[in-house]
Each structure stands twice: as C-alpha cells, then as structure tokens.
C-alpha cells in the first residue's frame, strides 16, 4: 500500500529524529539525548521476549523520565566503572516504518545494530526499536522507546551504557 505525501513527509521527519537520537548516543552527548524525551517518557528494554508486561515481569531497563535523568547524572560522575574508559559506539539504523499517526503522536519502528568497542572486547547489539513520538512544535519528543534486543533471552554480561 502506498503512502500519502503527508505520510512520506512524516516518515522523513521521524527518520531524521531517530538518526539524530542515535548520533547523540554514539557521541555520548547524553544531556542533548535527554532533551529528546517527553516529561512522561518511558525507556524500556524488555527481557525474555518482546511482548511482556513490564509491570509484572522483569525488564533489562524500564525507566521513567526521572530514572533516565538519574542514569545520566550517574554517568557524569565519572564513577560508572563499566564505562571507564568510555566505550566507542556506532549505530546503524534501518527499515524505519511508520506504524501509526494520530496527528499528535507518531508510532514508528526501526531495526538497529550497535557496535560497541571497549577494552573488555567488542560486542554487537541487534534490536528492533519501537518509538512513540509526540509532536512538539517542529520537532518530536520521545514518549516511549522500546528496544527489543534480539538476544534478550540470553545472559547479557555487560551493558554499561544507554542502549
């Protein structure tokens, strides 16, 4: 099924937003990354599948906006042992799909591959990311970012950064 010109424009806008979000994370610009979040934003990395209830089952990450801010403050202390020295990161985002647009919020999904290089070794993290983005002026704010890791049913030995 084809897209309308409005849908194509929306998809281009949200794709650029997601690319910017990925770049900010890769460059460890976490204050700027934090500014992309809505006040009621939720950051969720489920464990053991992708269709669980995060209120009932364990998650790798299930953070509200204040917890996101706390993680960033902790990172800035320089005392995050897992990130000393800092990992070098690079994400590749692809297959961005417009799922729903109700005029106020846009739901999109994308595939992502993250390469992490650290003194303990290199790791590749693969995921399907789902976003709910709220329109705010000419930009968006993240209301939900759900990162479904391909291997989220396996032991994850180190994830000392915000994926």
Question: What are the roles of these predicted feature ranges?
Answer:
Residues 1-39:
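Short, low-complexity N-terminal intrinsically disordered segments enriched in polar/charged residues
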Residues 9, 56, 121:
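Conserved aromatic-histidine-acidic binding/catalytic patches
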Residues 12-16, 59, 66, 124:
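A generic "alpha-helical surface" signal
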Residues 21, 33, 68, 108, ...:
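Hydrophobic pocket/interface hotspot
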Residues 21-23, 79-86, 118-120:
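Short helix-to-loop capping/linker segments positioned immediately adjacent to catalytic or ligand/cofactor-binding
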Residues 39-109:
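A solvent-exposed, acidic/Ser-Thr-rich amphipathic alpha-helical stretch
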Residues 90, 97-163:
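A beta-strand edge to alpha-helix "cap/lid" segment located at domain peripheries
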């Amino acid at each position: 099924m084809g897209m309308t010109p409005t849908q194509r424009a929306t998809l281009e806008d949200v794709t650029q937003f997601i690319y910017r979000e990925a770049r900010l994370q890769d460059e460890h610009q976490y204050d700027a990354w934090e500014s992309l979040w809505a006040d009621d934003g939720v950051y969720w990395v489920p464990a053991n599948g992708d269709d669980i209830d995060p209120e009932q089952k364990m998650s790798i990450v299930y953070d509200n906006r204040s917890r996101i801010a706390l993680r960033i403050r902790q990172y800035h202390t320089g005392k995050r042992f897992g990130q000393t020295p800092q990992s070098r990161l690079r994400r590749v985002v692809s297959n961005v799909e417009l799922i729903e647009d109700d005029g106020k919020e846009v739901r999109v999904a994308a595939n992502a591959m993250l390469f992490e290089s650290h003194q303990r070794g290199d790791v590749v993290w693969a995921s399907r990311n789902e976003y709910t983005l709220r329109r705010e002026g000419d930009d968006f704010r993240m209301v939900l970012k759900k990162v479904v890791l391909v291997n989220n049913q396996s032991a994850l030995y180190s994830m000392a950064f915000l994926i």
